[in-house]
Amino acid sequence: MYGEDSLADSIGLTGYSVDGDGIGGVLKSRIADFRVDEISTSVKIDPRGRFTVANITLTNWETNRFVGKLAKACGISRNRIFFAGTKDKRAVTKQIFVIDAPQKRVAKVEMTDVEIEILGRTHQKIGFGNHKGNRFTIVVRGCCDENGQPIGAKEALERIDTIKQSMEEKLGNGLFPNWIGPQRFGSGRPVTPIVGREVINNDWESAVMTYLTLEGDENEEVSNFRKHVRENGITQEGLDIIPHWLGFERDMMRHILEKPNDWVGAFRRLPNNLQLMTIHALQSVVFNKTIKARLDNDISLSTPIDGDIVGRVDDNGQLETSTMVAVESRTLERISRNCKLGRLAITGQLPGTSMMKPKGEFSEIEKSVIDSMELSQTSWRVEEIGRLTTKGTRRAMVTSFQDFQFEEVPIAGEETMGEKWKSGVKDGELWHPDGACIRFRFTLPSGSYATTLLREFMRVPLKQL
């Protein structure tokens, strides 16, 4: 077992599905080492359509910030740009965007590390999660053992195969725990669930100040800015020293300087999807802790028990939440068989105002997680911004990975590596520059996280993912 990880603790991402020795290593040593290709649902092209459809490749762009820049370049509101999901930042990502702007205007946009391929026009918007899945090609560099000593490719490949076989025996073929990955919470700065807690408590000043001041794994310029605001509040001086790329923080501060005490208005300066993400992030911590609690109680994630809530899994690997049912003793055998075949999945809680709840032993486990997080008295209603009120839902506790391949790749030259690699191994990290490099290829359904699958094989602190 690898060392304690405070980031993992804060988002509930602790423990593993099976025992075993990981391969260590680090992700994203080079931007090209992490590639995501979205498997899009078909968008019907119509020359008379209102919207422009484009396949856009981003290199080292955070999705929300790119959308803001694209909106400005097109002269439109960011709310007129539609996409199916946010992707990893330090990566090469390719996905569909639907843009409410003339095709010629979009075609003229030129941005660094952005390739825009115009596909045509459409009447059809796309929404969050409106894609089939993602294909990943990811290189893990610097493999090592639990003591930080380098391991070769043969040893690394054997460890991967051993863990994969153990997961198949425990969970089923091609299944892994459906943990919600660190990027949902703000990689390196898990601010969103903390802000989300303040939002559902209707404490808007704390929500804004937390977003502005919570420190994470950021550079010195950003840390100094956050420290200044934490110690001095929102001032013109703080606005003057804000790093230019922190556009959301700048907008929030300007709003308060112009309209003192309008904390709800300041929070609204965040993009709508990021506002909602704060609520989803808090729900996600609950879900991750629920997976861990079920594992700790030695209850299978893939074989149901009496009282569980199960739902149908469609052909794209998505849970159909509208038809979930409770497991009863008379249906247990049939449901177990369908879970084993991948047709049904056991679900865990994403709490809200009216979420369907299990019964029996798992009900007590879910309640204990809510109690431990001091959320038992929470209504999940957000009066000032009603669209942030959530009914709650449930999420499959395991998900599938397909087309899984892993192989050795050569160690890359030092000159091609990023700063994370060049700065060397830091205290608490588990990788070694002389260790083997392994390339993984696999496909995941929409809403599942590559980092949480690789975490099962690497077993490293989250800052290495």
Task: Outline where the language-model segments fall.
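Generic structural marker for isolated residues within well-ordered, non-membrane alpha-helices
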Residues: 67
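Pseudouridine synthase
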Residues: 448-452
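Extended, charged/glycine-rich binding lobes that contact polyanionic ligands
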Residues: 1-45, 51, 59-64, 73-441, ...
